[in-house]
Regions:
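SDR active-site strand-loop-helix element
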Residues: 13, 36, 68-72, 106-112, ...
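Conserved glycine-rich Rossmann-like NAD(P)H-binding loop of the short-chain dehydrogenase/reductase
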Residues: 32-42
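N-terminal Rossmann NAD(P)H-binding glycine-rich loop of SDR-like oxidoreductase domains
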Residues: 10-28
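Rossmann-fold cofactor-recognition segment
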Residues: 46-59
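NAD(P)-dependent short-chain dehydrogenase/reductase
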Residues: 133, 145-194
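NAD(P)H-binding glycine-rich loop region in Rossmannoid oxidoreductase-like domains
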Residues: 58-90
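Active-site helix of classical SDR
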Residues: 135, 139
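Conserved Rossmann-fold NAD(P)-dependent oxidoreductase catalytic core, especially the SDR/UDP-sugar
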Residues: 96-133
Length: 194
């Protein structure tokens, strides 16, 4: 969908987050990227990122872009449970409003959490999603369904747990927490050792 010879303009939403800042670091010199973030997590704003809430963008601003790479929103179940109204607004209703204005292609960060209720099954792209068991799952399933029903030009990336280095590391993720604990305390804590 995106290649290094493109003259297309890319809007990167969530550029200051865990995945967004790594994507921007790797691709900023190869593509025509305009990066934004609303600093929901109050991280320090990294260079080349504009502090803009996508929900405040006007239709003419949005449609200056050909492609939207959507890496924004409440990014975990714990964050979403702590702020369910914010999760719904950020992950669903705000995104629906944005998509209704945007005329280009959307590459969207969904989540493997859409399969949470399918216990023990191996899932692939053709697996039917399960019933949501929390607000995070609900917003991800709902936005996937909305884009399909509205015939939007989109790709939904259903990330599993992402780990690894980033300028804005997510310390609550299992592997990242284990590495941090091993380095800082010479111990690894198991949350559910049985």
């Amino acid at each position: 969908m995106i290649n290094k010879y493109t003259t297309q303009k890319i809007l990167l939403v969530g550029a200051n987050g865990y995945i967004g800042c790594r994507f921007l670091e790797r691709c900023k010199d190869k593509y025509n990227i305009y990066s934004i973030d609303n600093l929901l997590k109050k991280n320090d704003l990294l260079p080349n990122i504009n502090q803009i809430d996508y929900r405040e963008m006007k239709i003419n601003e949005i449609n200056e872009f050909d492609i939207c790479l959507w890496l924004a929103g409440h990014s975990s179940v714990p964050q979403s449970l702590a702020d369910p109204e914010g999760c719904y607004d950020n992950n669903y209703s705000g995104l629906v409003n944005f998509m209704n204005m945007f005329k280009g292609k959307i590459i969207y960060a969904s989540s493997a959490s859409v399969y949470t209720s399918i216990a023990g099954a191996i899932c692939d792209e053709d697996t039917t999603v399960g019933m949501p068991i929390n607000i995070y799952d609900y917003t991800k399933i709902s936005i996937d369904n909305y884009m399909s029903i509205m015939n939007k030009d989109f790709v939904s990336l259903r990330f599993g747990t992402v780990d690894g280095g980033s300028k804005h590391i997510r310390e609550e993720l299992l592997l990242n927490k284990m590495v941090k604990d091993a380095l800082n305390e010479n111990k690894i804590y198991l949350a559910n050792p049985k």
